[in-house]
């Protein structure tokens, strides 16, 4: 499998004749108006993660089923679930897809297909700080590059669809969290 395999559809691409289920355009407009009226407003996402053993953990988010996280066999996990970095990329893909859907709705474009393909080059030379290359600085760890490709179809030209994708990327909260340094604190209970 080449490094580009994950960025391309693996099945034959067929044009869908129906449109994706739309979001509430009126609700989106009200949410946008609220943001214009109070640009400093913030929400708080909360997650509670519990280790089961080895590297397998369960993250509880609201009333949803827990998100299971594990590491692959070559990193001493059991490979029963996506790795933490894959979960991060999943969040990025979900946020970009939400943004594309919102911007398309705002612009009056109906989407018939939307898929986001991501891959990221991640480094962990310090072995989580457990005796690896401890001389490496944090900027040399974690994602060093992320590549995203968006497959989008709808009732607009390629140019308009590309503008929608670029606009959604520019304003994506998760993409901006990854691109921009954010205050981060950690403490024990």
Please describe what each predicted stretch is.
Residues 1-90, 100-189:
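Extended beta-strand/beta-hairpin segments
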